């Protein structure tokens, strides 16, 4: 576990990997579960905020992969599960160009690394959560997008989901657990979308 203010620092990420090795002797699974969104399209979003989105959402994944891949290769394999977002696949209700671009980048980074390391026994996949009901939705997003009206935000989000309800963190976790497990031994370079059908919907 690397705290949110350190995930963009190479030395801190390497120290995390080294600490895991010291404690457990090997690393079989890496889950990159980092994310934060900033509102705004290309005009509204500042260059500083754009850079922050790329660093926090994408560079963090790059650094963790960079430092763990040699360890996994040395030990004969492993599984990497990266977390992206449906914002990297489609419009999800608000302009957040930095977040969307960085999460799309996570998916493509995963595909490239998956192909490069497939013959070394290392699998790399992405879980793509949709609009879930998490504490962050009520604590932060409602203030950003619905003037603090939690019920209004939830109603808007549910309306986009064909399943008619929002999942939660357990749904994301179950997908990640599958991809990290031996049951997914022939699965690499792909995504599991956990969104109640939202991405498949065309309107």
Model features per residue range: what roles?
Residues 1-3:
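Short, small-residue-biased leader/transition segments that mark boundaries at the very start
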Residues 41-54, 157:
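Substrate-binding pocket helix/loop in short-chain dehydrogenase/reductase
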Residues 65, 102, 110:
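Active-site helix of classical SDR
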Residues 70, 115-116, 185:
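Alpha-helical segment proximal to the catalytic Tyr-Lys
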Residues 85:
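Residue(s) in the substrate-gating loop at a strand-loop-helix junction
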Residues 90, 176-177, 188-203:
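Short C-terminal tail/terminal secondary-structure segment
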Residues 118, 123, 187-189:
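Short, small/polar-rich loop/turn modules that mediate ligand/substrate recognition or access, typified
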């Amino acid at each position: 576990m690397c705290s949110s203010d350190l995930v963009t620092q190479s030395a801190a990420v390497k120290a995390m990997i080294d600490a895991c090795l010291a404690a457990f002797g090997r690393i079989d699974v890496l889950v990159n579960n980092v994310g934060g969104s900033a509102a705004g399209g290309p005009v509204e979003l500042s260059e500083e905020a754009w850079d922050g989105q790329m660093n926090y959402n994408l560079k963090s994944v790059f650094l963790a992969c960079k430092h763990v891949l040699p360890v996994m290769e040395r030990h004969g394999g492993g599984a990497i599960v990266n977390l992206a977002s449906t914002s990297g696949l489609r419009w999800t209700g608000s302009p957040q160009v930095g977040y969307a671009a960085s999460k799309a980048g996570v998916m493509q980074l995963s595909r490239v690394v998956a192909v490069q390391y497939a013959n070394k026994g290392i699998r790399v996949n992405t879980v793509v959560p949709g609009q879930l009901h998490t504490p962050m939705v009520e604590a932060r997003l409602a203030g950003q997008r619905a003037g603090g009206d939690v019920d209004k935000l939830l109603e808007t989000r549910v309306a986009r989901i064909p399943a008619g309800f929002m999942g939660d963190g357990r749904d994301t976790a179950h997908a990640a657990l599958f991809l990290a497990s031996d049951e997914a031994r022939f699965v690499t370079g792909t995504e599991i979308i956990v969104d109640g059908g939202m991405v498949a919907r065309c309107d």
